[in-house]
Amino acid sequence: MTTSGNSINKPDHSAHTPMMQQYLRIKTQHTDKLLFYRMGDFYELFYEDAEKAARLLDITLTHRGSSAGEPIKMAGVPFHAADQYLAKLVKLGESIAICEQIGDPATSKGPVERQVVRIITPGTLTDAGLLEERGNSIVLTLALHHGVIGLAWLNLAAGDMRVLETSPDNLASELERLHPSEILLPESLALPVILNSFTAPKRLPDWQFDYEHAMQQLTRQFGTRDLNAFGCEELRAAIMAAGALFEYVRLTQHTATDESATQVLGHLQTLRVERPETYLRMDAATRRNLEITLTLRGEEAPTLSSLLDICATSMGSRLLRHWLHHPLRNRITLQQRLDAVSDLIGAKPGILYAGIRERLKHIADIERITSRIALRTARPRDLSGLRDSLTALPEIIKLITTSTAIAIHRFVPAMEPDTTLTQLLVHALQPVPGAVIREGGVIADGYDAELDELRALQKNCGEFLLQLEARERERTGIPTLKVEYNRVHGFYIEVTRIHGEKIPADYRRRQTLKNAERYSIPELQVFENKTLTAREQALAQEKKLYEQLLEQLADFIIPLQEIARSVAELDVLCAFAERADLFGYTKPVFTDDPALDIEAGRHPVVENQIEQYIANDIQLGAVTREGRQMLIITGPNMGGKSTYMRQTALIILLAHCGSFVPAGSARIGPIDQIFTRIGAADDLAGGRSTFMVEMTEAASILRNATAQSLVLVDEIGRGTSTFDGLALAFAIARHLLTQNQSYTLFATHYFELTRLAEEFPQAINVHVTAVEHKRRIVFLHRIEEGSASRSYGLHVAALAGVPDKVIRNAGKILAQLEQEALSKSPQQTLFETIEENAEAAPASAHPVLDYLEQLHPDELTPREALEQLYLIKSMANRIK
């Protein structure tokens, strides 16, 4: 079997030793993988594989003799510790073929027969030791048909296979959303630039993407004549991708025939189609800027996910991450989730969700255990975990059904375990089974009569040995004689050297130690043969029974998947309820009106990082007299502009996940997409400058945003000359107002943009407030109407630790520039400050100026300064 589509010319290995001939023959079938070749208690790697493994795993590279006249480079890892090395290789994007000894060394002529029994790739992980407990491993295939990109992806550990079709322009957004661990492409397809940021994609032969071949593969797996029932009959590119994906998975799971694939991949029961209108769309930049699961620095906390993820099960944690990256637009489903959260909070406040969460902690990862049962790779502890989970479910069900939380009663039917399944596991397994079946101790006593008989023979061993020891002591007169056992030498009689003259003639020496001799006698040898045979037979019988048990459990895959889904969703909703209860979140209201009305909104993550958070309102659309469409936000750096913008997006995101939101109230109209253009950095891998990245993101917004989109734009036009940047910012804002007509929050330091409010009544100027007290700036973090008068740029620089000398010099330069600006009237600027010793430009008499001359700012408190600011604003309005 090989997953590579390249034809391989069979090389001549006759000059090599028989063992190396065997190795090279197997290796030629898996040239694109590291071959873990089992030799005794080690997995060995040879030649180039050894060099690569030594480098990646930091293990020793050695030589073992020679073959065909060349030294054999080799490196190895212990069999019992292989998982930790495999996990490291998989994280580095490597694929591994596991080659085991399947022959009996005692009867083999020449090298022991070996065979690849398992292939591990980054996207097809199912072993608990290789998977991230709260993360997913996804393999994705990409096909192109008539300019349409078809995507198919599979979470093998969950049995979840999905497809969609999209445009090439949207590929980056989809990959950012799905974050695949492994990407597969046709050999003939040119590599899209976006894939440069992912682990090197693997190439598959073009024939695997053939449409007819794909249809044949998929209909056989799902037992249907066509794919109409899945709603994807028209998605030709997606079907091509799905067919190639299934072929790849079939081969990696070592199911060589279609029949065995259908049997072993039995947990792949359906093909789900994702359509653009299903989810609230977010492009790659938006997902990064909102810090949903990773901060901008690439850390896991503090993020929205880290705040909300108090899930009791790993299934719940994975589902939460999925919901956060796949916010729904289906309001019926969202209302069901919101009602469930409301009932969980309202039913005996705090008691119900806490009680459910406490019991959920005893539920194992049923989702992944079910997949391993289907793949026949489930280990004994998987099955005991499933057994314990099924026996714990009735208590959770009772807690739900006896509560007043009607909205969560819908989970009960799917969560009720099949009593036949539970009884089978209880009857078949030891209370605490052994870790691996090859060592026994897994199947319970009383489950199989033949196994019980073989075990009884072994248990009587101890009694026989005690009797033999007593008898031999009496016969030989040696009081310290011992009858013992070890794995190397089997059963033996041990006698210290001082009693050497008492050794009977029928004692046969087996081993000499420093202070003792070990012997055997015919009676002990007969018993040893009988006992060891019984042990081998018991292990073989136990292995057979375990395989039969897995076959029986495979019949329960569908109900187990339903249980897993219900438990995971209940877990997430309980987490939502706890967070909402603790942090004072409120239930959002969805409306059909084109409006966004949030009172006392807060940033869910930031408010938990600081002592006091200032809440702010936002009204856009039909709830306002002007039909507000755009807020032009001005004000100082560090004043809270970006936080205000992000909190608006996060509140909408949470609502579309079915969570309560950090606000006094929230009314949300139809939203189809969220776009952000916040911050930027060089894209060195893609060869793009900061400004190019910024403009690319802006272009995506202008092309795709609709009247139902939320657009966040922060500091557009930086990275180029002042006038170029201003012109672009002005044109982009105007386009958003007149063409896209999206809900827009537009933060800027270009004061000229505030003139848009004079031209368009749907554009409103707002600013973040700050006051200066005793030469220091105080950020009030409150959003108020009107444009800002100052940016306090030099104050922020001082707060950042810029030396005083530099700040003073900057003040003088700024004062000079401003004086020149009065005569030349170039671009206005928000970056205004007054240097104490700088000579001010002459000004004509004005009541506001007269009033300002009477004020002494250093004597005012921040509150008094704010009051004076409002008074001056009022005076200016009256004079107009």
UniProtKB/Swiss-Prot annotation:
GO biological-process terms attached to the record: mismatch repair
Pfam families assigned: MutS_I, MutS_II, MutS_III, MutS_IV, MutS_V
Chain sites annotated for binding ATP: G635, P636, N637, M638, G639, G640, K641, S642
Keyword field: ATP-binding, DNA damage, DNA repair, DNA-binding, Nucleotide-binding
PROSITE patterns: DNA_MISMATCH_REPAIR_2
InterPro entries reported for this sequence: DNA_mismatch_repair_MutS, DNA_mismatch_repair_MutS-lik_N, DNA_mismatch_repair_MutS/MSH, DNA_mismatch_repair_MutS_C, DNA_mismatch_repair_MutS_clamp, DNA_mismatch_repair_MutS_core, DNA_mismatch_repair_MutS_N, DNA_mismatch_repair_MutS_sf
Any GO CC annotation of this UniProt entry: cytosol
An annotated Gene Ontology molecular function: mismatched DNA binding
The organism's place on the tree of life at top rank: Bacteria
Signal sequence interval, chain numbering: none
Family that this chain belongs to: Belongs to the DNA mismatch repair MutS family.
Role, per record: This protein is involved in the repair of mismatches in DNA. It is possible that it carries out the mismatch recognition step. This protein has a weak ATPase activity.
Official protein name in the record: DNA mismatch repair protein MutS
Gene behind the chain: mutS
